[in-house]
Amino acid sequence: MTDTTKIDYSKTLYLPQTEFPMRAGLPQREPLFVQRWEEMNLYKKLREQAKDRPLYVLHDGPPYANGNIHIGHALNKILKDVITRSFQMRGYNSNYVPGWDCHGLPIEWKIEEKYRAAGKNKDEVPINEFRKECREFASNWIRVQTEEFKRLAILGDFENPYTTMNFHAEARIAGELLKFAASGQLYRGSKPVMWSVVERTALAEAEVEYHDIESDMIWVKFPVAGEVATENDLSGSAVVIWTTTPWTIPGNRAVSYSSRIEYGLFEITEAENDFGPRPGERLVFADKLVEECCAKAKLQFKRLRSVSAEELGKIVLDHPLKGFGGGYEFVVPMLDGDHVTDDAGTGFVHTAPSHGREDFEAWMDNARQLEARGIDPNIPFPVGDDGFYTKDAPGFGPDREGGPARVIDDNGKKGDANKVVIEQLIAADKLFARGRLKHSYPHSWRSKKPVIFRNTPQWFVYMDKNLGDGTTLRSRALKVIDETRFVPTAGQTRLRSMIEGRPDWVLSRQRAWGVPICVFVDEEGNILQDDAVNKRIMDAFEKEGADAWFADGARERFLGARAGEGWTQVRDILDVWFDSGSTHTFTLEDRPDLKWPADVYLEGSDQHRGWFHSSLLESCGTRGRAPYNAVVTHGFTMDEHGKKMSKSLGNTVTPQDVIKESGADILRLWVMTTDYWEDQRLGKSIIQTNIDAYRKLRNTIRWMLGTLAHDEGENVAYADLPELERLMLHRLTELDELVRSGYDTFDFKRIARALVDFMNVELSAFYFDIRKDALYCDAPSSIRRKAALQTVREIFVRLTTWLAPMLPFTMEEAWLDRYPQSVSIHAEQFRPTPAEWRDDVLAEKWRKVRAVRRVVTGALELERADKRIGSSLEAAPVVYIADKSLSDSLEGLDFAEICITSGISVSDAAAPEGAFTLGDVKGVAVVPERAKGEKCARSWRYTTDVGADPEFPEVSARDAAALRELQALGKL
């Protein structure tokens, strides 16, 4: 007989055993995995493993090689990494080649700052010396950002990234430009562009952001000019315009009206101001706006008659500055414009084609007719690149006493242009009224200073030129947008509206660091089309980079025998958006490990006007379609109160800080649980919420690892599995479909939420809780225990592989703990799910079982709260079920085991008054009762067969049998 007084029953249980730590220690542990992956060259191993699989390519939108990464970079790269890893684990060769955008103004600024600090003048430094320093600056930040991305567990070909400053890349970018030139899409023109005086360069739409500022606003009188028929009383009257940019008045060349607006001729009857209209003056306004305008000027008026659009189209006006500076003696025509409304202003639009896109278009639409009427159609250049008026603004430019007035100075501050123009309008008695207005105004996204529209000679790509096949760049792009998948779908509408309304693409910048517009032009601006010249350029760029264009003797070198023909070398550089828009050429097309087009582009929502946009135009212009099949966008990260992060507010959250304090997997979990396509929030409390969620997840993984330490790999045939195990396998089938669908549709939050809920609700609080007794206490030969181990094994393998793309550090740690000889979890595939596991009938049955169980557990929770029981094993409740379908669902089940009680009774009798119920489970009531029998010293269950085996008098018959089996195996 065994001396039971010497048995430590806890040592006879199959309790979880694992060295997988409860405390993650991610900040210390994660770098060890980064090192391991690098030493084993995991990325290369995955490429070799997957070389015969279909390619899946996410083309990396290049971040700018300037500064440490911020939270937006982290969000972006984590999303990309999850996509590439998930496709890799689903049977694809999912390559990820990181890239960097290296040219452009921000880097130039940094080098110029260094020069200024050293007392050097950039203009005195040879251009290629300056470009060399820009290249070194970018290279340094690429190295820094590479390490920061690796620390986030971003897996990619960091040994062979792409950069826009690579010599081959520069050659390909130049080659793409030459394609536009050869097809006639590239032209040199004069158009108003957004110009940064501070940065001395034109800006693309993607480089502009809007902020509220306060501006002068003025109403200006344009007198009706010329011979007007005697019966037309418009003679001697004036048309009034309104503008918030007084400095553009010298550039005025027309006044626009709308044939859809009703106008009237009005006479001033009373005036309170010392300046402006006097009684008796006759003025033309939109009927809808006259009262508001005259109130601003403190005027009383009366309406004389209606003025038709036909009348307006026949008259011309005098310039309000006529007689000043000797340069405003021309007439100002009236133009019918679709852009004119009567929502604000006067119903007339001051039209300065040098200073506005709509003004320019209205002028150019009428250029032929204007010339036929003897009006000069040429557009002036009233403001220079430094913000000063030029000779095209007589009286305000170099001929002005004291020098030219200035619109904006080098620091982005307002100059004196508005002041001097308003003063002259007052002197000429052409100012109707004045005021101040707070409104949204464009600013450079780099300098944060206001920009201006100014007419400049620039290089453009036509949006609406026939490309020889009946299409235009615009029509091609719009067609392709309809053929592209967008996530979220609103991105399609957004990009379409931008393409529909955009002007011709401005390609040129007046800077030094970038790929040059490598063309030669004659005196008329015609581009030299010579294949031999172009080949010399391309060959030189391939070997020496674009610096070759700026080297001494470059003109003669490239032109060769044509050097004496008078061709001029263009010195402008390409807009960096053309660089990044061309990345598909030297990555997707040129790298054997990639393919064209990419399966997906993923960037922030601002890239509808940025990289998505420029890539679409570049590719449609040269290849007729987009370089991507799908576009995924994410929002921006705000603080936890929904405010924009800024250093001045002290509310920034850096990825470096989160990683240092909590670990990269915490940051990745946050990304996975956000609605990333919208703006997200991040702060201390949100990070803590994710830490708490991670701990629960980690503890579930840890419990499985500890439990599986006793797994000997035995399998039970599916038909012999208990219902509970078959239910769990069914749930794995459902989750497998959800996970695969979620990764396909980039709906990561859906996956994360489903898996976390499954682990917390269905595993920890249900399946694992129920099966702990069998797993810990059953005999080694128990089919129930073997089935449970087999099921936990299947759950572990699937959960860890499903979560590996999201939490690569933690899942690698767990996988290697379970399979220490494995290469990596990231070399695994999602396991296929046997068709027999799906059992919808069983799932419906267990939906009912769990509903009844909820009522039981609810009743027992009250018993515990009132301290009538300490554990559910002390209970043997009576369950009253009036719904036969619910009672039928319990047939064949050990419902006490499922409710984790020592006993349970089911009755179809009427429930006694006071029985516990739940409102959402009809027809079920529970009366708690204490369990009968004695407490088993090993399993702690109360049974009536404790001591049935005299050799083990302290335990139940089940536990005694288990102890005998352990004894026979020499484990007791």
Swiss-Prot record:
Main localization category: cytoplasm
Q: Where in the cell is it found?
A: Cytoplasm
The alphabetical list of record keywords is: Aminoacyl-tRNA synthetase, ATP-binding, Cytoplasm, Ligase, Nucleotide-binding, Protein biosynthesis
Annotated catalysed reactions = tRNA(Ile) + L-isoleucine + ATP = L-isoleucyl-tRNA(Ile) + AMP + diphosphate
Q: Name one Pfam family in it.
A: tRNA-synt_1
| An annotated GO BP | isoleucyl-tRNA aminoacylation
Entries under HAMAP family matching the protein? Ile_tRNA_synth_type1 (MF_02002)
Q: What PANTHER family would the database entry show?
A: ISOLEUCINE--TRNA LIGASE, MITOCHONDRIAL, SOLEUCYL-TRNA SYNTHETASE
Q: Tell me the protein's name.
A: Isoleucine--tRNA ligase
> Which source organism?
Brucella melitensis biotype 1 (strain ATCC 23456 / CCUG 17765 / NCTC 10094 / 16M)
Q: What is the organism lineage in this UniProt record?
A: Bacteria, Pseudomonadati, Pseudomonadota, Alphaproteobacteria, Hyphomicrobiales
